[in-house]
């Protein structure tokens, strides 16, 4: 813990006077109990992973308080200090305000593919895999996250610091590109409830023709999962996110956004 705090202090001293420095995030994805126990069986080296566990909220709050105290003493007042929600967005309430923290932001990572994961592990898997059910399911899942973001944002500005359009519907859809566009519009409209949103921008695996965005969709070497929607360059090249199309224009995406009122 002390080592991590020292690294944060060194980073703050190095970059505090950079005019382009918007913020520093204290820690990336401190895992919750539910997330850890849902993925703990995927360790590549079981012996090395032995003893690992989730990050308790009490410990995380203590670390965040110490990190804030050290960083705020170094950074300029206008520089934002960002804290990840630890996959517990609604557990924070007004804690940051009560802790006396100024100019802070809460980062939450919202992946549709992760939201739907538990549903496909249960007995209703075949039902959910039928494409006609997935748009309804996505409206429900993303809508619930939008409500959670709005609730948390009453106490602290919320940043959707990671998201992407990966989902199980598009690869099974007759029109893959249109499915991705609908999922994009649905999420962008929901994440507008936050102070900002950042698409995952790193390429996880190259396609069959590196740099072209064409060829066979890249696959996760661990489980064969689809990675094509994680690469922002590929997504943008294929038009799966469209800058010239308002993401609240429901007329072009009736199957997912049909229940939204225009301009919401």
Please state what every model-predicted region is.
Residues 107, 170-264:
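Aromatic-rich peripheral "rim/lid" segments of glycoside hydrolase catalytic domains that contact
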Residues 1-169, 187-210:
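Active-site region of glycoside hydrolase catalytic domains
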């Amino acid at each position: 813990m002390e080592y991590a705090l020292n690294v944060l202090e060194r980073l703050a001293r190095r970059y505090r006077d950079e005019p382009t420095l918007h913020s520093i995030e204290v820690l990336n994805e401190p895992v919750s109990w539910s997330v850890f126990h849902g993925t703990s069986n995927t360790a590549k080296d079981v012996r090395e992973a032995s003893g690992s566990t989730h990050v308790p909220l009490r410990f995380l709050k203590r670390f965040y308080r110490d990190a804030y105290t050290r960083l705020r003493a170094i950074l300029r007042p206008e520089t934002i200090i960002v804290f990840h929600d630890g996959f517990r967005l609604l557990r924070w309430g007004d804690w940051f305000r009560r802790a006396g923290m100024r100019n802070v932001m809460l980062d939450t990572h919202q992946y549709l593919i992760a939201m739907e994961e538990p549903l496909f592990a249960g007995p209703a898997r075949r039902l959910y895999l039928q494409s006609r059910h997935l748009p309804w399911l996505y409206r429900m899942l993303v809508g619930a996250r939008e409500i959670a973001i709005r609730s948390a944002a009453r106490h602290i500005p919320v940043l959707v610091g990671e998201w992407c359009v990966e989902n199980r519907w598009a690869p099974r859809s007759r029109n893959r590109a249109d499915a991705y566009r609908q999922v994009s519009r649905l999420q962008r409209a929901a994440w507008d409830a936050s102070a900002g949103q950042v698409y995952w921008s790193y390429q996880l695996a190259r396609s069959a023709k590196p740099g072209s965005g064409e060829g066979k969709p890249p696959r996760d070497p661990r489980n064969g999962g689809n990675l094509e929607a994680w690469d922002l360059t590929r997504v943008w090249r294929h038009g799966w996110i469209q800058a010239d199309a308002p993401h609240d224009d429901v007329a072009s995406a009736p199957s997912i956004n049909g229940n939204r009122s225009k301009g919401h």
